[in-house]
A protein has these predicted regions:
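Hydrophobic transmembrane alpha-helices
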Residues: 1, 14, 30-40, 90-94, ...
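Generic hydrophobic transmembrane alpha-helix motif, especially the helices
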Residues: 1-32
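Glycine/proline-centered hinge or cleavage motifs at structural transition points of membrane proteins
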Residues: 2, 62-63, 76
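Membrane-embedded alpha-helices of multi-pass transport/permease systems
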Residues: 5-8, 27, 34-56, 83, ...
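Alpha-helical membrane-protein architecture signal
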Residues: 23-26, 33, 37, 55, ...
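Transmembrane alpha-helices
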Residues: 43-44, 66-104
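C-terminal transmembrane helix and the adjacent membrane-cytosol boundary/short C-terminal tail
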Residues: 45-49, 53, 60, 87, ...
């Protein structure tokens, strides 16, 4: 689903129906959470299905309840895939700007927001604003912002790969 659709959904539901303030971090967080949910859900389902049925059957056969089977066998074995999907979803949300533009996170904010309903901006939009400014001094800020964003993306994706390789068990 294109990310702009999630921005329109956030605009319709969170701003028009729930009457939350424009460019509030809580609205941006809810829109990005909705956007990353499909990635996390698909990774979680794939990770849960990857656990062999013989492990479930063996736990049930030894007298474990369904809750104990899920809690002690299924979740620990599928946790690396779940964490990997979560981190990849978060790294996708880190670089998104289209849904946040739809809810009004475009202004330059001078002060640090004091609450979740104060106006705020995000780094991809701030990079765009710095790049579109004609002043020469913003060129260094743009480059630094891009480097910070890329560093976070590389670290998050590296963490996802590390978690996947470190905790994945071979059947």
């Amino acid at each position: 689903v294109p990310s702009i659709i999630f921005g329109l959904l956030g605009l319709a539901i969170f701003l028009n129906v729930m009457h939350l303030p424009r460019s509030a971090p809580v609205v941006g967080g809810m829109v990005l959470a909705l956007m990353t949910l499909p990635t996390i859900i698909i990774a979680t389902r794939a990770s849960l299905k990857a656990v062999p049925p013989s492990i479930r059957e063996a736990a049930i056969g030894l007298g474990a309840t369904k809750f104990q089977t899920v809690n002690h066998h299924l979740l620990p074995l599928s946790l690396p895939g779940i964490l990997t999907g979560t981190i990849l979803g978060m790294s996708r949300a880190l670089g998104e700007s289209a849904p946040l533009l739809m809810i009004g996170m475009v202004a330059f904010i001078v002060d640090i927001p004091g609450s979740f309903t104060d106006s705020a901006t995000v780094l991809p939009i701030q990079i765009y604003l710095w790049k579109s400014t004609a002043a020469r001094g913003f060129l260094e800020l743009t480059a630094a912002g891009v480097m910070v964003l890329l560093t976070f993306l590389i670290l998050m994706n590296g963490l996802a790969v590390y978690i996947r390789q470190r905790f994945e068990t071979k059947w």
